[in-house]
């Protein structure tokens, strides 16, 4: 009996081997062709590619899997690998088969230029997250310029001043809700609160309808989780839900446009209504494309400013001297609160508050997505949900028509060239003790190179569209929270390790298990 079983097993093994051999025989030519093709690609990239002569690891030049490995399998570590490359190879390096990165603040204004200086295209390596066709992910320079012009009037300094009452009302409600929490003694996830504040503002500006997250018992927890849980947010279900939310707002705006007089249409009562009222080609009015645009506005208008608040409030609460000095400076200008109030430009002129904002933005500028993480986000990999520092990953720009020149190097037209504001903001030669939060570095006479290297909103034709809106929210958020008589916040079981980044995923992440910025209100 046992011999029969062994014979049967042996027969099965032989059948399996024969099947594998037959399959191999069928696909052998294809496998051989693939092997030859792969070798040819590697040889081309290493020896014949226009970037072949640029310094950097040969493995990184040969394949994008090198970047993928450090970002995905090592857990967001390619930033640090790039820093190691710079130490070994110099300020200009090839980090993958197609892309260069330069670490030199004097070169920043060569890469990030105004639209009338030269054409600047977007690096297509960022298209994997599902927002293709939106403003920030528009590759072509001319199309980007056309799309951006539709939004610029709404986000100008003058327009933001016009809608400042909306921001002020939300800031007052923010302070009121925090003060109400003092009666309960509850521990508050301040990131959820600030997500509610920024989310209510951007949604109101875009659609004239506030979701009133700031009034919710859990504030903006769901909104915060959806936006901060990047790449898992881009799993099909989660991302589709967010797009459906954006699509609803676009469809509502379109219906409203049909029901109002044409003379009333070209007004700035909301971003969506204003953009839809412009002379936009029909292809640009496609609901799916506009929904992606809306998703980008909702996300970028909330995530980046919330991260600023998280970092800046943490360091302000941790250092009593900073908090007391800020409160003292706000005493006179906020004395008439809540009836008589300054403008955000007047708040901007307060020296110490201005210094805190600049230092906070040095720490907490917007995030950027790498090409390998863009690809991985579409594969549903899930990471931690908290972001708390500034740009760690480089942003890349393309000069499609003309070569760029860096020292002895000539960079061919069409080459993505990246630079990282994280590297600029943490350069010890420009910012001594760069990992210390020191607003005083921006007071009095300071090194002019600090302004040269301070690029939280980037520069050039693709700089941050919502910069003025961000400033208005930032100044009002800090003013209502740290004014004398305002809500008295105290850190609760939160230390720097809950804030400081150790992983680079889309934006930076703190340690695994971080509980974020938690406070109590007294």
Swiss-Prot record:
Subcellular location(s) per record: Membrane
Catalytic activity reported: stellata-2,6,19-triene + 3 reduced [NADPH--hemoprotein reductase] + 3 O2 = stellatate + 3 oxidized [NADPH--hemoprotein reductase] + 4 H2O + 4 H(+)
Keyword Cell wall biogenesis/degradation: no
GO MF annotation terms: heme binding; iron ion binding; monooxygenase activity; oxidoreductase activity, acting on paired donors, with incorporation or reduction of molecular oxygen
Membrane topology of the entry: Single-pass membrane protein
EC class: oxidoreductase
Glycosylated residues in this chain: 267, 451, 495
Transmembrane segments: 23-43
Keywords, sorted A to Z: Glycoprotein, Heme, Iron, Membrane, Metal-binding, Monooxygenase, Oxidoreductase, Transmembrane, Transmembrane helix
UniProt protein name: Stellatic acid synthase
Source species of the chain: Emericella variicolor
Gene designation: Stl-P450
């Amino acid at each position: 009996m046992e011999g029969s079983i062994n014979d049967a097993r042996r027969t099965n093994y032989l059948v399996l081997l024969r099947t594998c051999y037959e399959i191999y025989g069928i696909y052998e030519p294809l496998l051989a062709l693939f092997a030859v093709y792969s070798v040819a690609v590697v040889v081309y990239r290493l020896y014949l590619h226009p970037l072949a002569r640029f310094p950097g690891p040969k493995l990184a030049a040969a394949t994008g899997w090198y970047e993928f490995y450090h970002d995905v399998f090592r857990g967001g570590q390619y930033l640090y690998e790039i820093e190691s490359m710079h130490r070994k190879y110099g300020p200009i390096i090839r980090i993958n088969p197609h892309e260069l990165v330069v670490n030199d603040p004097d070169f920043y204004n060569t890469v990030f230029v105004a639209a009338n200086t030269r054409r600047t295209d977007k690096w297509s390596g960022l298209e994997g997250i599902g927002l293709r066709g939106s403003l920030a992910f528009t590759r072509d320079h001319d199309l980007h310029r056309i799309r951006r012009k539709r939004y610029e009037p709404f986000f100008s300094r003058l327009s933001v001043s016009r809608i400042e009452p909306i921001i002020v009302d939300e800031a007052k409600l923010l302070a009121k809700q925090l003060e109400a929490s003092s009666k309960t003694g509850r521990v508050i996830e301040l990131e959820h609160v600030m997500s509610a504040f920024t989310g209510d503002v951007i949604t109101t500006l875009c659609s004239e309808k506030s979701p009133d997250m700031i009034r919710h018992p859990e504030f903006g927890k769901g909104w915060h989780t959806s936006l901060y849980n990047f790449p898992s947010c881009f799993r099909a279900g989660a991302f589709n839900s967010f797009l459906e939310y954006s699509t609803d707002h676009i469809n509502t705006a379109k219906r409203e446009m049909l029901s109002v007089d044409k003379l009333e249409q070209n007004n700035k009562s909301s971003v969506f209504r204003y953009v839809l009222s412009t002379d936009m080609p029909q292809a640009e009015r496609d609901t799916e494309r506009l929904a992606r645009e809306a998703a980008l506005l909702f996300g970028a208008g909330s995530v980046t400013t919330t991260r600023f608040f998280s970092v800046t409030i943490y360091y302000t609460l941790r250092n009593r001297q900073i908090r007391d000095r800020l409160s003292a400076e706000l005493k006179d200008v906020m004395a008439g609160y809540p009836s008589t109030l300054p403008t955000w430009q007047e708040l901007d002129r307060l020296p110490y508050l201005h210094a805190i904002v600049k230092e906070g933005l040095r720490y907490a500028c917007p995030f950027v997505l790498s090409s390998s993480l863009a690809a991985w986000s579409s594969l549903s990999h899930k990471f931690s949900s908290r972001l708390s520092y500034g740009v760690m990953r480089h942003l890349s720009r393309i000069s499609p028509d003309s070569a760029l020149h860096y020292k002895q190097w000539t960079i061919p037209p069409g080459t993505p060239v990246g630079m990282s504001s994280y590297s600029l903001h943490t350069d010890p030669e420009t910012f001594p003790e760069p990992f210390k939060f020191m607003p005083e570095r921006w007071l009095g006479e300071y090194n002019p190179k600090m302004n040269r290297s301070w690029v939280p909103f980037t520069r050039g034709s693709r700089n941050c569209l919502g910069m003025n809106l961000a400033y208005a929210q930032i100044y009002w958020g800090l003013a209502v929270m740290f004014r004398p008589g305002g809500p008295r916040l105290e850190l609760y079981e939160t230390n720097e390790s809950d804030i400081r980044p150790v992983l680079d995923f889309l934006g930076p992440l703190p340690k695994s298990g971080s509980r974020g910025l938690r406070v109590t209100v007294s």
